[in-house]
Each structure stands twice: as C-alpha cells, then as structure tokens.
Amino acid sequence: MMSQGGTVYLVGAGPGAADLMTLKGRALIEQADCVVYDALVSPVMLSWAKPGCEQVYVGKRAGNHALPQEQINKLLVECGRKYACTVRLKGGDPYVFGRGAEEAAALYAAGVAFEVVPGISSAIAGPAHAGIPVTHRSHCTQFTVFTGHEDATKTESTLDIAGIAAAKGTKVMLMGMSRLRSTLEQLMAAGQGGEVPAAAIQWAATARRRRVIATVATLADAVEQAGLGAPAVVVIGDVVACAPELDWYSRLPLAGKRIVVTRTREQAGELSSALSMLGADVTELPTIRIVPPTDRKDFAAAVVDSPHYDWLIFSSPNGVRKFFEAFFAVYEDIRELGGARIAAVGAGTAAELKKYGLMVDVMPKKAVAEELIAEFDRKADEFGGVANVTMLWVHSEKGRDVVYKELMKRQAIVDECIAYNTVPETEDPTGAKARLQEEGADLITFTSSSTVKNFMAMGIELPQGCKIASIGPITTATLKEYGLTPDIVSENHTIPGLVEAITAGFAS
C-alpha cells in the first residue's frame, strides 16, 4: 500500500538533445516541486522548471559519483514524502541500464507512489544521429544491446561474451569506453570477426557529437588516436557502413557550432530552438531578467486608462506581453481597447500583438525608434498627422526616449506606460557560465543593449576565435561602446532574421 504524499516520476531524459524529451516528461518538469537529475541531462531541461523548484544533482560518471545509489534511493523516498511532484530525471530510458528499477523498488518498499515515463534510449538514437540504423532489411533484422560497465560488487560477470560474439545482427554497447579495448579483444577471442565495421559515437544525439568509424580490430586504436571518451555508444555490425550516406546531421548548416544565447530565460527558447534545429550546440546563458516596473501603480493606472487613447505604441514584445497580462486582469474582452490604432517597433513586436488578434497600423521596416518616427511622418497624410493626438507609449523602464521626444516635437499628446524593467540575471542553475569559460564557443548572440551590458558585467573573457552576432544597430552600437565589433549583424531585426544572418555568416 502506498503512503500518503506525493508521487516520484522516473523520467527518461532521452539521448541528450532537449528537443528529444517526451511531451509528458517536459510537462512533469514544468510542474515539479523538485527535480533530481543525472550528469548527462541537458541543462536546457532544467530551465523548464518553475521558479522555486528544488534542483538536486546526483550525477554519476565513471569513477565520480556525486551520490552513491543507496543515498539516491533514500533521497527519492524523502522527496516523495515531502513534495507533491518529484521528477527523477535520468539520461536515456530509466529502465535501460539506468538503475531505474532499483529506484522504483526502493520507492515501492517505502510506500511512495511512483510512475515511470520512458525516454528515447541512446542505444537507438545515438547511432541514428550518426547515420547508423540499428536494423536494416539489407543487413540485419535484429540487434543486441549490452553494457560495458557491470556492477563492481558482482563476484563474477553475467555478461555472455560468447553469446554476444555469436549473435547475429547489430551489437550496441553502452557505458563501455573505459573497457573498450579489453571488451573488443574478448569478443574477438570468442569468435567475433575483427573485420566487421564498428563505430564509437561520443555525445551521441547532441550537437557536440563526435564519431569514429573503423573495424572491430582497429576501433580501440582509432578511438585513442581521436581522443574520444565517455559518454559514448559503440556499434558493431554491417549497418555501420550506412553512415556516409545516412549521416543527416553533419549536413545541417550549423552542425557542431557552439552558440551562446544571452536572452532572458523565458525568451531564449525561440532562438535556441531555431539554432538547434540547424545543428547548433546551444548554451543558454541568460544575462537579463524581466521584472515588474518600479512604479506598479502608475503602470496599472496606465493600463486601466488605455482604452481612452487614439494610439497605442509598443516598443518590444516584452512590453506587449506585460501590458496584456495586466490588461486582462482588468478587462475581459480585447474589444475594450476601442478604436485605438496600433504602432509597433519591429516585426517581432507586431508578431506578439498578432497573438492577441491585433494588427498594426504603423510598423517600420527596421526595428529602431527613429524608423518608427519616420514611418509616422510618411503616413501623416493617411492618418492626419499626430498633432493633438493622444498616444500611450508602452516600453521598458530603461528604454530610450526617442519615441517620446520626437512625438512631442510633433505636438502629439504622449503618456508613458512603463510595463517592465530589466535587471541582471544573477542565477545560473545550469552552469552555463562555467561551460562557456571551460569549453569556449564559436558564437555569442546579443539581442538587446541590456544583454550586452550585463554580459560584460559578468566579467567573462570572450573565448579565442569566438564570433559575435548582433540583432540590429542599437545592439551593435552598445557592443562598440565596449570595443567589440560584431561579425554578424541581422538586417531584419527579428529572431528569424538573426538566425538567417547567423546561418549565412557561417556559410561564408
């Protein structure tokens, strides 16, 4: 009988890439009160957790255990009794060499409710990411998966080397890099053909992937020469010969490029996802955080009065989101805005407005305030100018005042609606800063002046050879204030435009 309390979910994190997590797995992380995670879990997955969620690292790598398994079992029992929802996030699938069954048994014995959420195993996804199918009608119709790292407390091995050597089809070894040479020698001694194609894939199914292709007899030497290590998947079989034709990942335009995204934690997803889809290894290092404005009363009053204005002017997508969060706390219907016309600085802001069913009347081609003013001037005959017209300008606390000053010069009646403020991000739960400093990067992206200023305030030295990408002229100007000239500048000052510019930049 299960005791009263919460539920512990044993969730498979998949083979490495965050976008290969199951929908149920992500939903559980988003609602979790506590996440207990392993070493090979993508940091992006941890960023899905809600504010206040306790995150406990219990990673285990060969020879380096943050916490012994018995203590992990005890911890899960404690969390299950303390929290309504605990996610035990495990690389790959919880029940494929993941000791998930041991954890489930410990929870059952303690009377703690648990569920298992399967994940995509690296035994299948790792080879697939490297162009190697584990089955193929022309080569094999079965495959064998075995571990190269058995329980050290066993008095004798339960691994059937002779059976594996004699087995037909593809053979996949997980967690075997530290014993690769001896395992391959044992297999050949038991009858495994040394001339059979073999491959080792490090960081399989991630943008950091490295691959070595050889034969069973030569793979250990090839791995040493290439400097490959754990974590890795080893594949033995004729299907390895498919890799040159079926290696789709290496043909992606940003394959293997390490790119840093400095947007807010909430906004990073759009850019990160687009870059990842093109093959990039993305590190999210938020440098800013969106917080309420200093004067919340003024903001609330401006939102309440917004239906009385002739024009609403939005300077950023953040301004749109924060404005309408407050608007719908007061009004139930978007039509309460009345007949106000809408102006937006940039296509990104216009796209955010469209989510609320609002189309813009004025939008410059370039997402800068000066261009918005010029657009108002160009359309003066169409709208009758801005003199004596009431306008509510929705912007950030640290935004430039170009819009306000220029419209006032044209005798518009402009009120400000400060919808949010940006502050430096002080938390780094995923260790992104350390990863950047230790592993470097090919490119760092900046999407606003605030991201530049706060990144520089972190005191991080730019990695040697690292390029810089800027979303537009204002961000570029801020970079130059710090003596930095971006290598890539987006002509279309939107996230899709920045992605396009980055892709073109690396192609050249």
Regions flagged by a language model, labelled:
Residues 33-35, 55, 86, 133, ...:
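Short, well-ordered beta-strand core segments
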Residues 153-199:
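Conserved anion/nucleotide-ligand pocket segment
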Residues 1-18, 23-120, 124-125, 220, ...:
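Class I S-adenosyl-L-methionine
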Residues 42, 52, 116-127, 142-154, ...:
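Conserved beta-alpha
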Residues 43, 72-79, 129-133, 157-161, ...:
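Short, charged beta->alpha transition segments
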Residues 6-10, 34, 83-87, 142, ...:
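Residue-level preference for the first positions of well-ordered beta-strands
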